[in-house]
Amino acid sequence: MRVLGIDPGSRITGYGIIEKVGNRLVHVDNGAIHTDNHKEFALRLHRIFEGLCEVIAEYRPDAMAVEQVFLAHNAQSALKLGQARGAAIVAGVNAGLPVSEYTAMQVKQAVVGYGHARKEQVQQMVKSLLNLPEIAQADASDALAVAVCHANSAGMKNILRSIR
């Protein structure tokens, strides 16, 4: 299963692609989509959407996982962040991908084993789990963590579905 993890942001949206092969997690790619702060906000959202459509077309993931974000510095930031998440989710749905959402606490729990882990602990664990030579850029590292969370959670979700 190939998973595209997303760390949404109105200025920088991080993405990370991993492949689950048996019990192993394999790093495929990661990066960030940057938007121009000087451009109209609608055009920035369009850039996020188009950038993720390109990533999806190139890497053909089986699923998308997006981090839910609850904290923002102010109401305006929260609204912009929500809109960036929406652009990312629509890119996934537009490509026919199942989209799952995870809270930061769920991601930390899945990656580190502790829901209140520090950002550095999550980054170090992502580096270790994916056998990366160095810690990825912050937004991309967060996106890889979301992908790891989904890859590890998807198996459990399938088991629970089969029980019902």
From Swiss-Prot:
The keyword Nuclease applies. GO terms for cellular component: cytoplasm; Holliday junction resolvase complex. Mg(2+) 2 binds at residue 67. It is found in: Cytoplasm. InterPro entries: RNaseH-like_sf, RNaseH_sf, X-over_junc_endoDNase_Mg_BS, X-over_junc_endoDNase_RuvC. The RuvA-RuvB-RuvC complex processes Holliday junction (HJ) DNA during genetic recombination and DNA repair. Endonuclease that resolves HJ intermediates. Cleaves cruciform DNA by making single-stranded nicks across the HJ at symmetrical positions within the homologous arms, yielding a 5'-phosphate and a 3'-hydroxyl group; requires a central core of homology in the junction. The consensus cleavage sequence is 5'-(A/T)TT(C/G)-3'. Cleavage occurs on the 3'-side of the TT dinucleotide at the point of strand exchange. This is Crossover junction endodeoxyribonuclease RuvC. It comes from Geobacter metallireducens (strain ATCC 53774 / DSM 7210 / GS-15). The lineage of its organism: Bacteria, Pseudomonadati, Thermodesulfobacteriota, Desulfuromonadia, Geobacterales.
